From Swiss-Prot:
Name of the gene encoding the protein in the UniProt record: sipS
Note: B.subtilis contains five chromosomal type I signal peptidases: SipS, SipT, SipU, SipV and SipW. They have different, but overlapping, substrate specificities and have different transcription patterns.
Pfam families per the UniProt record, alphabetical: Peptidase_S26
Record GO biological process: signal peptide processing
Organism of provenance: Bacillus subtilis (strain 168)
Name by which UniProt lists this protein: Signal peptidase I S
């Protein structure tokens, strides 16, 4: 009887140890490797839709660099924003006649094709209002939403973001399940 109790206690301890290890690993993964986020709003439409869930790669924040064109989750004061990095530290960003210029060079934005077409159908002669040039300071990033007519971003209220304020890069949509896809 005594050996049966010892065996049960040993089994319970083994299970408890396995559960603790699993919880610690889950917390480490969630806080330092990748995390789920909910897209709130239409500022990235049609690339991302309102209420979609994305996985965010957080490792780039610690062991890499962000690239122009990355879709990122930003930590705001009370909310998270999902935007696209347009300008890197040291860049000069300008929009003229619906054409993006970085450091004086034209930049192609193929992800805006559907929105540009829709803007013209809606009677607008351009998708993105002219702005700039804006010099992006060191340690800051200039971001914009893909739905330029319906996005608060670095142009109009959110300002520039530091690397510390960027949670990570969105790599794919995982929900709704029937619309899983890469985001970049």
């Amino acid at each position: 009887m005594k050996s049966e109790n010892v065996s049960k206690k040993k089994s319970i301890l083994e299970w408890a140890k396995a559960i603790v290890i699993a919880v610690v690993l889950a917390l480490l993964i969630r806080n330092f490797i990748f995390a789920p986020y909910v897209v709130d709003g239409d500022s990235m439409y049609p690339t991302l839709h309102n209420r979609e869930r994305v996985f965010v790669n957080m490792t780039v924040k610690y062991i890499g660099e962000f690239d122009r064109g990355d879709i990122v989750v930003l930590n705001g004061d009370d909310v998270h924003y999902v935007k696209r990095i347009i300008g890197l530290p040291g860049d000069t960003v300008e929009m003229k006649n619906d054409q993006l210029y970085i450091n004086g060079k034209k930049v192609d934005e193929p992800y805006l094709a559907a929105n540009k077409k829709r803007a013209k159908q809606d009677g607008f002669d351009h998708l993105t209002d002219d702005f700039g040039p804006v010099k992006v300071p060191d340690n800051k990033y200039f971001v914009m939403g893909d739905n330029r007519r319906n996005s608060m971003d670095s142009r109009n209220g959110l300002g520039l973001f530091t690397k510390k304020q960027i949670a990570g890069t969105s790599k794919f949509v995982f929900y709704p399940f029937n619309e899983m896809r890469k985001t970049n």
